[in-house]
């Protein structure tokens, strides 16, 4: 009888440990969209792109944290100092300190420029202005108050919005 209770107790402990470990791993991988002082702490005041530094529009910035200290940060910048051809493709910056996917396409760790095009694409550019990724966006016609840039948490990641158009960012 004693042996049976010991086996049962050991089995229950193993089950509790495995379930709690799974919950901890899941909690570490969840996105949290930052706001307030948490947001201002991680968003840079300016961003370098194609030979110039432009100030960040803090009201049009957003960031998400996943895990203990992994971030995806985005913001629109004042592009008035850039040439017209650069302004046509570059709206802001996207910084990620871990590999992510955007609509299922992998993007490595780094700092990038981005722009949403009129034909429903999100274009990711390296700091020299070369396009390295282009994905189709989805229109969210149910959104009541679109903003120029924002992130919202969903079950499988974060929606990265420009107005009503969005792309899904997920951890890799």
Residue ranges and their predicted role:
Residues 23-85, 134-172:
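Primarily secretory-pathway and cell-envelope proteins
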Residues 122-139:
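Short, solvent-exposed cationic patches
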Residues 78-127:
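Mid-length scaffold segments of soluble, non-membrane domains
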Residues 10-20:
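Bacterial N-terminal signal peptides
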Residues 3, 21-23:
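Intrinsically disordered, low-complexity serine/threonine-rich segments
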Residues 1-12:
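Bacterial N-terminal signal peptides that target proteins for export
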């Amino acid at each position: 009888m004693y042996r049976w209770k010991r086996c049962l107790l050991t089995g229950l402990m193993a089950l509790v440990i495995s379930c709690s470990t799974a919950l901890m791993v899941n909690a570490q991988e969840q996105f949290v969209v930052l706001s307030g002082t948490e947001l201002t702490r991680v968003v840079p005041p300016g961003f370098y792109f194609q030979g110039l530094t432009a100030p960040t529009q803090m009201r049009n910035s957003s960031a998400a944290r996943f895990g203990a200290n992994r971030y995806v940060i985005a913001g629109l910048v004042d592009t008035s100092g850039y040439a017209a051809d650069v302004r046509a493709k570059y709206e802001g910056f996207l910084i990620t300190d871990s590999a992510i996917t955007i609509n299922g396409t992998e993007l490595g760790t780094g700092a990038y420029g981005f722009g949403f095009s009129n034909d429903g694409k999100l274009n990711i550019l390296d700091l020299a202005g070369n396009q390295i990724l282009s994905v189709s966006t989805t229109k969210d016609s149910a959104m009541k108050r679109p903003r120029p840039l924002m992130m919202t948490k969903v079950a499988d990641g974060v929606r990265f919005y420009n107005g009503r158009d969005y792309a899904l960012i997920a951890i890799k």
